Amino acid sequence: MRKVLRVKKNIKIARIVPLVLLLVACGRGEVTAQSSSGWDQLVYLFARAIQWLSFDGSIGVGIILFTLTIRLMLMPLFNMQIKSSQKMQDIQPELRELQKKYAGKDTQTRMKLAEESQALYKKYGVNPYASLLPLLIQMPVMIALFQALTRVSFLKTGTFLWVELAQHDHLYLLPVLAAVFTFLSTWLTNLAAKEKNVMMTVMIYVMPLMIFFMGFNLASGVVLYWTVSNAFQVVQLLLLNNPFKIIAERQRLANEEKERRLRERRARKKAMKRK
């Protein structure tokens, strides 16, 4: 029981860590080569990498290439996170049945619920930590990349296609693209879930709207990063965790199970007639 409670406690802490990290890391001062903190040095390192990838001096190209590089490096972790989250979603109905079965608040009932829950995790090969580790690794990387675009002066200059990277997009095309790809990535992530989480369903529509309206006032370099990052995530989902294939496979297995039960009923009827 103590082990299970410790696991649940650690999961709650792990969920808070990214938010704490975000609040701690969100400095506003300009970052230079002389910045003293380790975090600022990481941000500056990212900025120099973007500058190095800026072929023909195009910071926009550098932002795109560096964002793609980071997303490619994090792809295995993202894939692990998605698969683990899908497994957790799949067993939610059974977990709720256990919670109904052991609804008592006494210690013995809670211990029994914990034991049954652990047995369920083991049965389906679900590790509650599996979806947390990738998130904890991705968060500081993505925050450092975001801050490189907002706190390092030489990344705030230049143009890319029709936009000034230091200014908002006067045509509002980048905010629209960022919102569209944000919607697609969250929608595809939630599409294959057996049971729709209300909060996730709300976020499918809230997140794109937030990105869209924030894109009105933010520098176009930041919005370009959002657009490329979410577009990459859409492609990654379709290639590695295609929800349409998952749904089709789930339906195929359900049909096979239905056919199996139908054959069993027919076999029993034939056996009864022979008697």
UniProtKB/Swiss-Prot annotation:
One of its GO terms (cellular component) is plasma membrane. It is found in: Cell membrane. This is Membrane protein insertase YidC 1. Required for the insertion and/or proper folding and/or complex formation of integral membrane proteins into the membrane. Involved in integration of membrane proteins that insert both dependently and independently of the Sec translocase complex, as well as at least some lipoproteins. Belongs to the OXA1/ALB3/YidC family. Type 2 subfamily. The keyword S-adenosyl-L-methionine does not apply. The chain crosses the membrane at residues 58-78, 129-149, 170-191, 198-216, 222-240. CDD domains: 5TM_YidC_Alb3. The lineage of its organism: Bacteria, Bacillati, Bacillota, Bacilli, Lactobacillales. HAMAP family: YidC_type2. GO terms for molecular function: membrane insertase activity. It comes from the Bacteria. Residues 1-25 form the signal peptide.
